[in-house]
Amino acid sequence: MKKTKKIAISGAAFAGALLSFGVAGAWADDLTQLPAAPPPPAPPPPPAAPTSPLIAPAITGPLTIQLPPPKYTLGPLGDVYVDGIGSGLYQWQTNPVPNVLPGNNRSAGGLNNGQVFVQKTDGLFQFYAQAGAYAITSLGSPFISTPLATWGANSPAGNLWGWFPQGFAKIAPTDNFSVEGGKLPTLIGAEYTFDFENINIERGLLWNQEPSVSKGGQVNYTRGPLAFSLSFTDGFDSGVWNWLTGSATYTLNPANSFEFVAGGNLGSTHINTLRTPILQNNSSIYNLIYTYNADPWIIQPYFQATHVPANFGLYGPSASTFGGALLVNYDVGAGFNLGGRLEYIGTTGNNNLLYGPGSGAFSLTFTPTYQYRYFFTRGEVSFVKANSVADGLAFGSNGTATTQTRLLVETGILF
């Protein structure tokens, strides 16, 4: 049997223990009365990412204007922002069509952007002005150099939109309602007019069927996730006001949006120039556009249909186009992006909207981009394959080639 060890405690020791316990307990009670040490201060919140106060230019990406933009206070006019771009372009292509426009040779290069953007973006009265030089390059179409596009109303390009391609005044009595008028960017399509605004350097086959700049007026209204715009303009910059265009956009969340656009000529227009092609300017056009934009992806598929009604006193039988495109950009990081576009367009009817009645075309474009602050550079390779072409209306010196490959390099500053 295990023995239990007896512990003897004297009265004095027991009293001392009680005294010690009492002192310790009282000391503990005193500690509980002391104020608690204040918690360490919370770290300051990270600075908010700058948001763009700019009206325009609209930029899909991956190129970005550095924020905050330069701002100047001009007395009673208030705060005015000034931005701009300067860039050069070199292009090499197979099967050029040299007899369409001067300089449309196997290779071309030079200044393709030298523009300044000035705008006031708050208050009741606002405005946007874009001025300078630009070139236009789009898939399957002749390259329009800066001198042809910008200078001289008698140039073969018809001067396109001149040295002042876009600019408008805007009245905004509330945050969700505004009216604007002037030389407006079109509501139609998923690609913008100038190359720096888009994922790719060249605009696509579908863009070739769309108006780019129109003179007229536009009303804008937003309510919650819905945004509406309605414009009355001269369509393909014809100088004849007979185009009505509307757009409706639903923003599901910051990453996802859906847009429907419809527009068309309410009458007929007899003008036929490079910037106002007679068939397209007498057409109606429809878009369905979905946009996903959340790092590291931009994904934008869209569908487009156009129709030109018959007018035998003006241009002849009817014709239509139908097509779709997928625009994609992936942000690799450290300033590098990889962009691409896949598209197809087909035509029906007995009039020529592409490379002859009933012709079609497929395209593939790849555009790597690097931007460090204001400096950017990007390259591009594109391929177009046409089908069911009419002799003399496709590629090459005789207009009978059915493919065209292009290599492009662009570099400059965007500030």
Where are these regions (language model features)?
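N-terminal periplasmic/intermembrane-space "pro-region" immediately following the signal or transit peptide
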Residues: 2-98, 415
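Outer-membrane beta-barrel channels and translocator barrels
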Residues: 75-77, 121-125, 174-176, 186, ...
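Outer-envelope exported proteins of Gram-negative bacteria
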Residues: 79-85, 128-134, 180-182, 231, ...
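Residues on the lipid-exposed face of transmembrane beta-strands in outer-membrane beta-barrel proteins
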Residues: 84, 111-120, 166-171, 181, ...
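Surface-exposed coil loops of outer-membrane beta-barrel proteins
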Residues: 93-106, 137-166, 171-253, 259-266, ...
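Glycine- and aromatic-enriched membrane insertion/assembly motifs of diderm outer-membrane
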Residues: 104-137, 331, 336-337
